[in-house]
């Protein structure tokens, strides 16, 4: 199994992302439920334009973040660190993603918040189930590495 496939399978099983944005010398983090898109290597989420992180992001901004499970033992730790770009989706692109998002999270139907995409450009996946401290690396230009 290639690196991106392994990372993607794990991301598809999770549902909460933490991401951080930077604007004018200020950092801010947020959490949200996400939908993983393996084809585009992206996370989709809903967040209101009035939130601090959305206002700091504007229409598009660099982003970094994490996705991690909550294992009870060190040997089962798995998690992703990433960097990429967050952008607010509009029009038909937003509508199509919203439909898929609502299939995964039906409760979100009550949220009129816009859809955002986090395009993942670099991923580091720690997977202790493959051995303590095992890391898989992926870059958008398709160069994958193992450490």
Curated annotation (Swiss-Prot):
Coiled-coil portions: none
Checking Gene3D superfamilies in the record gives: Electron Transport, Fmn-binding Protein, Chain A (2.30.110.10)
Give the transmembrane region(s). none
Leader sequence residues? none
NCBIfam families with a match to the protein in the record: PRK03467.1
Q: Write out the similarity annotation.
A: Belongs to the UPF0306 family.
What is the protein's name according to its record? UPF0306 protein YhbP
Native organism taxonomy: Bacteria, Pseudomonadati, Pseudomonadota, Gammaproteobacteria, Enterobacterales
Gene designation per UniProt: yhbP
